[in-house]
Curated annotation (Swiss-Prot):
Keyword GTP-binding belongs to the record: no
The protein's name: Heme-copper oxidase subunit 4
Alphabetical keyword list: Cell membrane, Electron transport, Membrane, Oxidoreductase, Respiratory chain, Transmembrane, Transmembrane helix, Transport
Gene Ontology molecular function, alphabetical: oxidoreductase activity
Length: 103
């Protein structure tokens, strides 16, 4: 019966982040769709999808920080990956969206 307890713990842990993961996946799919469809046609919707993606990453990161230390030496691999994804997403969205807005 120990494996059932392990699965329940895993399910409970996943449920904490479920809403954030749904927003993250939905906005990532919207970003990919808008990139393939053409950003120039829908720049404001694309920026909205990027903003949702980044805000859900931030929410996921801060939910993760409640259980993990903030100091750099004590940060886990998953925390470092979340930080890297957030930074890459922010830089990519700025570089992608900049040419489409009038100066």
């Amino acid at each position: 019966m120990a494996s059932g307890g392990g699965f329940e713990d895993l399910a409970r842990e996943a449920a904490k982040y479920f809403g954030v993961w749904i927003v993250l996946v939905a906005s990532a799919v919207a970003e990919v769709y808008l990139v393939l469809e053409g950003i120039a046609r829908n720049p404001f919707v694309f920026v909205l999808a990027v903003a949702l993606f980044q805000s859900s990453l931030i929410a996921l990161f801060f939910q993760h920080l409640r259980d993990e230390p903030i100091i750099i030496r004590g940060i886990t691999v998953s925390g470092a990956v979340l930080i890297a994804i957030l930074i890459i997403s922010a830089v990519t969205s700025v570089l992608t969206c900049t040419p489409y807005f009038p100066g």
